[in-house]
């Protein structure tokens, strides 16, 4: 996959979901030629603490870590950025890098929809839902999340490092 094939989406703070003021979400359509190798590819590029499952059907975000999702089965409609965000159709082979603070919610999916999720250098991650009492800490956390050292698909030469800065 060529770097120019990525898509980026920027989200503003919506009052509930802070989103990320520094980095856009990055979509890699069809990046996984062999979706069964997704977890291995992420691990080789030091995106670890991986899991395989679906995506929650409520708005949520992680304030203390970026996250990558690789679609390994099925397809889904996922809204990123909170209630007024953007709904994106994802399918087998697609990869999405979600910056810390960016909300995501599964709106609909095929019955076989599965993703692999992972975090740069296996960073621990919290789960936030946009409650008022979590907002101040979440915003402080987002400001302090380090840049990943590698792109989850392409390693040290990947487009994530160009888009988010080195």
How would you describe each model-predicted region?
Residues 81-85:
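Short alpha-helix capping/helix-loop boundary micro-motifs
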Residues 90-110, 119:
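Conserved metal-binding segment of the jelly-roll/cupin
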Residues 62-79, 97:
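Short, conserved beta-strand element in jelly-roll/cupin
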Residues 107-166:
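Double-stranded beta-helix
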Residues 18, 60-62, 68-70, 88, ...:
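Short, conserved, surface-exposed binding loops centered on an aromatic residue
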Residues 1-59, 161-166:
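A short, N-terminal "cap"/entry segment at the start of jelly-roll beta-barrel domains
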């Amino acid at each position: 996959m060529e770097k120019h094939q990525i898509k980026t989406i920027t989200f503003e703070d919506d009052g509930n979901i802070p989103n990320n003021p520094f980095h856009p979400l990055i979509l890699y359509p069809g990046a996984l030629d062999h979706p069964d190798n997704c977890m291995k590819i992420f691990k080789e590029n030091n995106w670890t603490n991986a899991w395989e499952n679906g995506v929650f059907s409520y708005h949520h975000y992680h304030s203390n870590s970026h996250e990558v999702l690789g679609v390994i089965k099925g397809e889904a409609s996922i809204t990123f950025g909170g209630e007024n965000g953007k709904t994106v159709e994802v399918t087998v082979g697609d990869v999405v890098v979600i910056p810390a603070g960016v909300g995501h919610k599964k709106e609909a999916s095929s019955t076989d929809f599965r993703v692999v999720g992972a975090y740069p250098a296996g960073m621990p991650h919290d789960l936030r839902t946009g409650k008022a009492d979590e907002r101040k800490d979440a915003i402080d956390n987002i400001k302090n999340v380090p840049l990943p050292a590698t792109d989850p698909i392409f390693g040290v030469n990947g487009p994530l490092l160009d888009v988010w800065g080195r």
